[in-house]
């Protein structure tokens, strides 16, 4: 039984003399015309198979049926456009992908008559087509002797490339050669699939300047595939393959616009269902487009070795490639566009292994084959069948291929830049929403004047603190951060600002000898963190305002120091009296209201000094740049929102708020791992004070305190117990 099967298989391999004496030749067709008819029939089968969504295995099987059929029958008796649909209809059933007869007829009509409308299924013409196709199918079956199982060279290509551990580029190139051998040559009628596979691998090696080494036992790689193969046979068939490519008509080298049609159909379907995925799909499309451009660029480039080639390609020797790729891709590209080889049918013996090795090449090459090869339509011209060496072939097309390579590289660069731009936009759009919003009501919210304040709507702080977890936020330097606080106040508020400046000056003088300094002790915890971290110029806060003292020191450890925002906004309100605020902590804290000359102050932070750099906290602040006239400085995501800020905060019950503030600050410091300790007392930072109110007398008094800091007074009464920590 096995011997009988081998004899039957030999029946379908023909010598050159038999090919030259085929039925079509006997009916008057010249050799080139017959080969052209075979190529056009294979082209039609490829197009129909893609439209019917059958696997490439099914299409290849139908092409072999067609080649064998025309070794028994003539093209003059059975037109290729009639045989092709019947062969595909039969192959689909053999490969377990049956298609409805109606669909096959409609697809064939669309491919052959794209301008005409589809026939009515009840019309006489349609019924006649159905009858003709069924009859042709039975004729093909009888002509083939019901030998329907086909062995393809692809199986052997994959096995051999795996055996010799060939590079991915070499495997892909060899695989495409096997497909093109079916489309463009009669090798399937002359040589067994293992021999054809060796020819394809040999041609791919020449193409990519790659040489498969001899095995350890001294055998060449092709001896493991087929013992009858010799190097002379491989060179002869490679030369014949190149000659066929050289004289293949240009119209068969063009890529059918299958990808555009498929993309248009997919776009319509996607529009019905998935608008929400549009942005993600755009990025994915750009990525796939970029990868396909890279592949095509690799195909068109001359590489020294396929192992060093960076892109999957039909590597490089563009010489032979220009022609071969034209037609080769005519077949491989077009079928890949609609059949990414993910569909592996149970009966697809060779495709299961092919998919593992070559799915990347198939999918990437499917996408932009048309761009690469439409431009090659004029590259090769029909020439007499004189022998052309591989070097001559390369030299002939080197210039054209260099131009195509440049064009494809430009296209690849454009696609990559578009992808980068789109990705950057998505990332920036995402980052713009990753912020934490803190609404901080400023004291005076229980002020009797609240109805008036609610009219102004904009005197509470709403701060948007950018998240520091991302790379962008982490890379921002403190000195690059500017702050903007825009306080919209009425005219009477500016009057109150001036009053507060005067009161603060008087209060500072009184406060130096004030007997109730025991409140210093309570404020030490709340001021410790901000004093130790902020530069000298940032110490001018209204620390007597309990809310501000807590908020300033709570946020002082962040790279975006928000303390300036509180000094600016607090300066727009009158200074509370010492007995109401619990006696402000340090002398420098009483100077805060001097910043009220403008509703905001523009400055950028220098690198934060350490405690060692701040002896007595009166160090030089020349590193700070103040710009008094600027009233619109910028702070990231900081807004002013509703909620009241009292123009007069005298009547607010401050004792409870103050204690709550101290407790909250201590809990936050403990959470950060900082143990609050008493810092050395110091005078207010003189640089900023002189900037607002230059006085000669202040210099002498400060100079004495700089070197010898004054110790803080002891509390006259113990602090009250702390309430539980806030959640």
Curated annotation (Swiss-Prot):
Residues with N6-acetyllysine modification: 391
Identify one Pfam family in the record.
Answer: CycT2-like_C
Claim: Lipid biosynthesis is one of the keywords in the record: no
- Biased-composition ranges, Basic residues, are 508-531
Q: Where is the composition biased (Low complexity)?
A: 561-571
The subcellular localization recorded is: Nucleus
Please list the coiled coil stretches. Answer: 389-420
GO CC annotations, alphabetized: cyclin/CDK positive transcription elongation factor complex; cytosol; nucleus; P-TEFb complex
Annotated Polar residues bias: 616-631
Ranges of compositional bias, category Basic and acidic residues: 487-507
| Keywords for the protein's UniProt record, in alphabetical order | Acetylation, ADP-ribosylation, Cell cycle, Cell division, Coiled coil, Cyclin, Host-virus interaction, Isopeptide bond, Nucleus, Phosphoprotein, Transcription, Transcription regulation, Ubl conjugation
Please list where the region (Disordered) is annotated: 487-631, 691-727
What InterPro entries does the record point to?
Answer: Cyclin-like_dom, Cyclin-like_sf, Cyclin/Ssn8, CYCLIN_CCNT1_rpt2, Cyclin_N
Instruction: Output compositional bias ranges, type Pro residues.
Output: 711-727
Crosslink site(s) for Glycyl lysine isopeptide (Lys-Gly) (interchain with G-Cter in SUMO2)?
343, 416, 482
**Histidine-rich domain (HRD), as annotated region:** 481-551
Task: Please cite one Gene Ontology biological process associated with this protein.
Answer: positive regulation of transcription elongation by RNA polymerase II
Q: At which residues is N6-(ADP-ribosyl)lysine found?
A: 486
Would the keyword Cell cycle be found if you checked this record's keyword annotation?
yes
Residue span of motif Nuclear localization signal: 253-270
Name positions with the PTM Phosphoserine.
Answer: 117, 389, 496, 500, 565
What domain notes does the record hold?
A: The histidine-rich domain (HRD) region is intrinsically disordered and promotes the formation of phase-separated liquid droplets that enhance binding of the P-TEFb complex to the CTD (C-terminal domain) of the large subunit of RNA polymerase II (RNA Pol II).
What's this protein's family per the entry?
Belongs to the cyclin family. Cyclin C subfamily.
Q: What is the protein name for this chain?
A: Cyclin-T1
Species classification:
Eukaryota, Metazoa, Chordata, Craniata, Vertebrata
């Amino acid at each position: 039984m096995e011997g009988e099967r081998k004899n039957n298989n030999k029946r379908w391999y023909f010598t050159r003399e038999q090919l030259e004496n085929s039925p079509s030749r006997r009916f008057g067709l010249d050799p080139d015309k017959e080969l052209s008819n075979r190529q056009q029939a294979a082209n039609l089968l490829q197009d129909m198979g893609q439209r019917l969504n059958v696997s490439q295995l099914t299409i290849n099987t139908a092409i072999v049926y067609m080649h064998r059929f025309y070794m028994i029958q003539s093209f003059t008796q059975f037109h290729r456009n009639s045989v092709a649909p019947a062969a595909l209809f039969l192959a689909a059933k053999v490969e377990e992908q049956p298609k409805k007869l109606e669909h096959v007829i409609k697809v064939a009509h669309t491919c052959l008559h794209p301008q005409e409308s589809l026939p009515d299924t009840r019309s006489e013409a349609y019924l006649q087509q159905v009858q003709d196709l069924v009859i042709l199918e039975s004729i093909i079956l009888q002509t083939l002797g019901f030998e329907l199982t086909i062995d393809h060279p692809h199986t052997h290509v994959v096995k051999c490339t795996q055996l010799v551990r060939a590079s991915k580029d070499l495997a892909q190139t060899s695989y495409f050669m096997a497909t093109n051998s079916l489309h463009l040559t009669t090798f399937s009628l002359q040589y067994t699939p293992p021999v054809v596979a060796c020819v394809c691998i040999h041609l791919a090696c020449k193409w990519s300047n790659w040489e498969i080494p001899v095995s350890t036992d001294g055998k060449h790689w092709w001896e493991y595939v087929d013992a009858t193969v010799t190097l002379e046979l491989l060179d002869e068939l490679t030369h014949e393959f190149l000659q066929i490519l050289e004289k293949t008509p240009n119209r068969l080298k063009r890529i059918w616009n299958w990808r555009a049609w498929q993309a248009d159909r997919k776009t319509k379907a996607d529009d019905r269902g998935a608008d929400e995925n549009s942005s993600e799909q755009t990025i994915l499309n750009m990525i796939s487009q970029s990868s396909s451009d890279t592949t095509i660029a690799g195909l068109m480039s001359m590489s020294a070795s396929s192992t060093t080639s960076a892109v999957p390609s039909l590597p490089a020797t563009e010489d032979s490639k220009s022609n071969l790729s034209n037609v080769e891709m005519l077949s491989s590209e077009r079928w890949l566009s609609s059949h990414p080889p993910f569909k592996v049918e149970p009966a697809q013996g060779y495709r299961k292994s092919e998919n593992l090795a070559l799915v990347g090449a198939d999918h990437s090459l499917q996408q932009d084959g048309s761009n690469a090869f439409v431009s090659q339509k004029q590259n090769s011209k029909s020439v007499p069948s004189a022998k052309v060496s591989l070097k001559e072939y390369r030299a002939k097309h080197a210039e054209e291929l260099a131009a195509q390579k440049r064009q494809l590289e430009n296209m690849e660069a454009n696609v990559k830049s578009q992808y980068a731009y789109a990705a950057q936009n998505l990332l920036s759009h995402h980052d713009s929403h990753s912020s934490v919003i803190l609404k901080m009501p400023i004291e005076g919210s229980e002020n009797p004047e609240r109805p008036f304040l609610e009219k102004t709507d904009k005197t509470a702080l709403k701060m948007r603190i950018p998240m520091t977890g991302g790379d962008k936020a982490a890379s921002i330097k403190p000195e690059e951060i500017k702050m903007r606080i825009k306080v919209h106040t009425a005219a009477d508020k500016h009057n109150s600002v001036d009053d507060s400046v005067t009161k603060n000056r008087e209060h500072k003088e009184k406060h130096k000898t004030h007997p109730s300094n025991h409140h210093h002790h309570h404020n030490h915890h709340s001021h410790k963190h901000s004093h130790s971290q902020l530069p000298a110029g940032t110490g001018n806060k209204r620390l007597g305002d309990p809310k501000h003292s807590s908020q300033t020191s709570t946020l002082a450890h962040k790279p975006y120091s928000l303390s300036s925002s509180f000094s600016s906004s607090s300066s727009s309100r009158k200074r509370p009296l010492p007995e109401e605020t619990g006696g402000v902590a340090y002398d420098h804290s009483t100077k805060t209201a001097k910043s009220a000359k403008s509703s905001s102050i523009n400055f950028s932070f220098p690198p934060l000094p350490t405690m060692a750099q701040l002896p007595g906290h009166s160090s030089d602040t020349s590193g700070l740049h103040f710009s008094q006239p600027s009233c619109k400085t910028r702070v990231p995501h900081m807004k002013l929102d509703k909620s009241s800020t009292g123009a007069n905060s005298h009547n607010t019950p401050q004792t409870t708020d103050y204690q709550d503030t101290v407790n909250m600050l201590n809990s936050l410091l403990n959470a950060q791992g900082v143990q609050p300790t008493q810092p050395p007392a110091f005078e207010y930072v003189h640089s900023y004070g002189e900037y607002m109110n230059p006085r000669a007398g202040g210099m002498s008094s400060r100079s004495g305190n700089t070197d010898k800091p004054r110790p803080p007074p002891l509390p006259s009464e113990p602090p009250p117990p702390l309430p539980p920590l806030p959640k």
